[in-house]
Amino acid sequence: MALVTRRTALTAFGATLAAVLAPPAGSAFADDHKHRAPLWRAHAHNDYEHPRPLFDALDHRFGSVEADIFLVGDQLLVGHTADELDPKRTLESLYLDPLAALVKANHGSVYRGYRRPLQLLIDIKTEGSSTYLELDRHLRRYQHLFTTCAHGRVHPGAVTNVISGDRAARIPMEAQSVRRAFYDGRLTDLGTSAPASFAPLVSDNWQLNFTWLGEGTFPDAERQRLRGIIGQAHARGQKVRFWNTPDLAGPARDALWAELLDAGVDYFNTDDLAGLEAFLDAHRVA
């Protein structure tokens, strides 16, 4: 496929952007959103599966969104499995172009008046090295949009890209002196030589590390392990996220989220945007 230029993509996107940026009166984004702080610890797992990718998460004030990508030719297509890919659903069309337009409209930030970057977690589903190198070429077209790391020094931008998924992406990333993306580490990376300037986030599968799923009492040994993990990461300037936590609304999910909150986890992983928003608001967590 021919690679669509940023200018062409933005021109095509502009026809619909105005409607997206000005949702109907009464929506959270149009009315209440501007008066309520973003929920920086809220992470939209598989965000692209919502009716309005990116914008549904922003409507619920989320601070992090996740997009799975496949390298097909020179295009980065967004989807969970290869058989559901649509050539029209690219990383540019669903995320990069809308974010660029939002940041321009909001004078340098995704959420107007809040300078903290939005996290874009990009989960690579195809071979990591080649996909990352193509992704890097795409990211270069968006000057001044992203947090960068130049020679070990981090320069904040409106959007921070964090690369997850296939671990082979690490090799070309480590070879770069200037990056527009950061690495999503695993618990096995804690305490290694990877600094927070390379791996600011540590994510792992909850159910491969803990047995408790929110019912009954949280075993004390597991609670101490959780707090130890978070403390170790925070001491190195890294943030922590767990995926595969219970996500069915009910007491078990609330109990587990409460333990994560008490332990100081940095991102709550969910498909239920409204449910997590309500939980964090009830606990007055930004």
Where are the regions a protein language model picked out?
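Phosphate-group recognition and catalysis centered on beta-loop-alpha active-site segments
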Residues: 2-5, 9-22, 26-286
